[in-house]
Amino acid sequence: MLAPKSFNYATVRVVPRVERDEFVNAGVIVYSSEQNFLDARIEVNEARLLALWPALDVSMVARHLQAICRICAGDPAAGPIARLSKKERFYWLTAPRSAVIQISPVRTGLSSDPKSLLDRLARELVGTG
């Protein structure tokens, strides 16, 4: 078994009505510089989002959430941010903002398998299948 290495992660939240501070966890971003890993898991739960704000444009939110995955992957079609280093992309994605899509505080831990960790965090925090 490989020795555990440090990682950082943050939860992606959709805050349909920013003034109410209600949110739905929609994804997780995991970054490990020691393992050269940056990836995200996103799941759009339309029913939960519409329960908070029936007028929400869920398809627009879904497009913005999928951009997070493309930026993590370094997809050139995702724009200039996707061309930054993995470290720069992670910290750009996790910067605080007051918008419909927000990010939790960054948390840290140890893992020898960041992909399995990402899958587990997505199941536990977002409820992905």
Model-derived regions: residue spans:
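Polybasic/polar functional segments that serve as interface/processing modules
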Residues: 1-129
